[in-house]
Regions:
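Conserved catalytic core of sirtuin-type NAD+-dependent deacylases
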Residues: 1-240
Length: 240
C-alpha cells in the first residue's frame, strides 16, 4: 500500500506548483533529534521534573537554572544535520513547486537544508534575545555558556525565541500559515500526530482535495485525508 501511495504522491507533486508542507517532530527524528511524544522521546526521559513542566513559562521564570540545565542538555546539546525530508522540501521550493514549510519544530533544520519560506509556529532555538534590551544571541552563545545566560550589554535575562507551554503562538505567523494552507493545491502533513492545538487545527483551513498524511503511526485525522502513507518521512521522501 505504501508503494501505491508513494506513486500517487509522486504524481500529485509532479502536477502541482502550489504545495504546502506542514510538519512536526517526526521530520527531525531521522536527524537524531528526539520526538517529544514517542516512546524514547523527551517526555519519557528521566529528569527532576516532567518535560512539560520544565518547558513552561512558569518554570522558566521560577527555576531558570534548572530550565537551562535541561534546555542545554536535551534541546541544544547536539549537532544535527538535515535529512532526506528537509532536503527534498528545499528542492521542491527551488523547483517552484513548494510555496511554504510550516513547522512545529524549533531546530532550524529546514533552513539548514536550504528552505527559504519557513513558518516556525513554535519559534527556534537558533534565536535568543535579551528580555530587557532585545540584543540577539545565537545558539552557540547559549550552548557554550553556563548557568542562566545574561546579556553582556545590559545584564538582562536572555530567553530562547521558542514558544513555551503557557505562552501563545505568534499571531502573525499563525495567520500567514492559515493563508498558505487555505490556498494550497496539495497539503502534505508529515511527522506529526496532530494532537497539539492550535497547530493541529490548521489543517481544517485546507479546502482542496489532495490532503496527504505521512507518519510512522496512524494519526487522529487519517479518516479525513485523501492519501495516507505510513512510514518514516525521510525514507518516503527519498523515494519521491
Amino acid at each position: 500500500m505504501a508503494k501505491k501511495g508513494i506513486e500517487r504522491l509522486k504524481q500529485w507533486i509532479e502536477e502541482s506548483d502550489n504545495i504546502v508542507f506542514f510538519g512536526g517532530a517526526g521530520v527531525s527524528t531521522e536527524s537524531g533529534i528526539p520526538d517529544f511524544r514517542s516512546v524514547d522521546g523527551l517526555y519519557h526521559q528521566k529528569y527532576d521534573y516532567p518535560s512539560e513542566t520544565i518547558l513552561s513559562h512558569t518554570f522558566y521564570r521560577n527555576k531558570p537554572e534548572e530550565f537551562y540545565r535541561f534546555y542545554r542538555d536535551k534541546l541544544i546539546g547536539f549537532e544535527a544535520e538535515p535529512n532526506q525530508a528537509h532536503k527534498k522540501l528545499a528542492q521542491w521550493e527551488q523547483d517552484g513547486k513548494l510555496k511554504a514549510v510550516i513547522t512545529q519544530n524549533i531546530d532550524g533544520l529546514h533552513q539548514a537544508a536550504g528552505s527559504r519560506k519557513v513558518l516556525e509556529l513554535h519559534g527556534s532555538t537558533l534565536r535568543n534575545y535579551c528580555e530587557h534590551c532585545g540584543k540577539f544571541f545565537d545558539v552557540e552563545d547559549i550552548r557554550n555558556g553556563e548557568g542562566v545566560p545574561v546579556c553582556d550589554a545590559c545584564g538582562g535575562p536572555v530567553k530562547p525565541d521558542v514558544v513555551l507551554y503557557e505562552e501563545g503562538l505568534d499571531q502573525d505567523v499563525l495567520s500567514e500559515a492559515v493563508q498558505f494552507i487555505k490556498n494550497a493545491d496539495v497539503l502534505i502533513i508529515g511527522g506529526t500526530s496532530l494532537v497539539v492545538y492550535p497547530a493541529a487545527g490548521l489543517i481544517d483551513y485546507y479546502r482542496g482535495n489532495k490532503l496527504v498524511l505521512v507518519n510512522k503511526t496512524p494519526t487522529a485525522r487519517d479518516g479525513v485525508a485523501d492519501l495516507v502513507v505510513q512510514g518514516a518521512i525521510g525514507e518516503i521522501f527519498g523515494q519521491l
